[in-house]
């Protein structure tokens, strides 16, 4: 870097607050002895003319480098104004778990800001891609957009585990159970045998499982021997007694109910024949 001489180009760049009419053109200076002898006659009356404000190295302005000024540079008051503008812009607050990180808080805060700005840049690219896809989907669905299409991932609603647990505990309520009962009743009614038999009849097929229905017993016809015995007993006595009915049932291998029904039917048949004969006699 060299000696900290007043006329060294690297050292002159650190002087900040100089009047606008005072300008140093560093390209005119050379390392010859005559020029140095001439420059030594220049004297500064007071330090206030050189720098009116004390310089704080911790509040360095990142917009302008302080070392290695190669060309002719004019230092004036606009330099401090630009520093104030950049300080106002950098004085932002990023909320974190521990504290509020600002730009003037030191090296740790500046590194946190740089990392967060990089993360925001990367997330902005992904967010724009996702929003573009969501917009395309919304236009395909007729231009309807959902509630959370334009939100960033940090602004998306997070499900509350306590609310989820409360909903799970409320799942045993009466109205939910009633809804489950009604749905189960509907499915049970749809799977009833009557509906399935009708569906099978419409489809022209048969069910693979037997029907659980009380079917009527198949009519068992009487044999000729049984009919002859019953006809002979009917000719002798139309109204048979209980004792005689038991004897016939035991002898003909029939039940008491069958013998009783046969005599009832036979009496009705005889009555119809008599009514027919009477009707034919009138004509």
Curated annotation (Swiss-Prot):
It is found in: Nucleus. PROSITE patterns: HOMEOBOX_1, HOMEOBOX_2. GO terms for cellular component: nucleus. Residues 215-274 bind DNA. GO terms for molecular function: DNA-binding transcription factor activity, RNA polymerase II-specific; sequence-specific double-stranded DNA binding. Keywords: Developmental protein, DNA-binding, Homeobox, Nucleus, Transcription, Transcription regulation. InterPro entries: HD (IPR001356), HD_metazoa (IPR020479), Homeobox_CS (IPR017970), Homeodomain-like_sf (IPR009057). The keyword Transcription regulation applies. The keyword Chloroplast does not apply. Coiled coil: none annotated. Sequence-specific transcription factor which is part of a developmental regulatory system that provides cells with specific positional identities on the anterior-posterior axis. Belongs to the Abd-B homeobox family. This is Homeobox protein Hox-C12b. It comes from Danio rerio (Zebrafish).
């Amino acid at each position: 870097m060299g000696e900290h001489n007043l006329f060294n180009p690297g050292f002159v760049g650190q002087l900040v607050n100089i009047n606008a009419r005072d300008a140093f053109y560093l390209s005119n200076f050379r390392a010859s002895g005559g020029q140095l002898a001439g420059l030594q006659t220049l004297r500064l009356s007071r330090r206030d003319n050189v720098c009116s404000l004390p310089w704080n190295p911790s509040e360095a302005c990142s917009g302008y480098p302080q070392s290695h000024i190669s060309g002719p540079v004019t230092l004036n008051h606009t330099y401090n104004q630009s520093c104030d503008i950049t300080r106002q812009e950098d004085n932002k607050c990023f909320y974190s778990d521990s504290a509020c990180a600002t730009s003037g808080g030191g090296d740790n805060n500046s590194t946190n800001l740089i990392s967060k700005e990089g993360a925001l840049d990367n997330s902005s690219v992904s967010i724009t891609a996702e929003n573009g896809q969501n917009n395309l989907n919304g236009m395909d669905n007729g231009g309807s957009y959902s509630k959370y299409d334009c939100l960033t991932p940090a602004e998306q609603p997070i499900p509350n585990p306590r609310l989820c647990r409360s909903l799970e505990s409320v799942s045993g309520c009466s109205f939910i159970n009633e809804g489950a009962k009604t749905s189960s009743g509907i499915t049970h009614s749809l799977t009833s045998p009557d509906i399935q038999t009708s569906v099978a009849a419409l489809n022209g097929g048969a069910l693979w499982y037997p029907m659980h229905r009380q079917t009527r017993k198949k009519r068992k016809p009487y044999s000729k021997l049984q009919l002859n015995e019953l006809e002979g007993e009917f000719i002798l006595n139309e109204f048979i007694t209980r004792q005689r009915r038991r004897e016939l049932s035991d002898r003909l291998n029939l039940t008491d109910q069958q013998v009783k029904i046969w005599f009832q039917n036979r009496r009705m048949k005889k009555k119809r024949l008599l009514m027919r004969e009477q009707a034919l006699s009138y004509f």
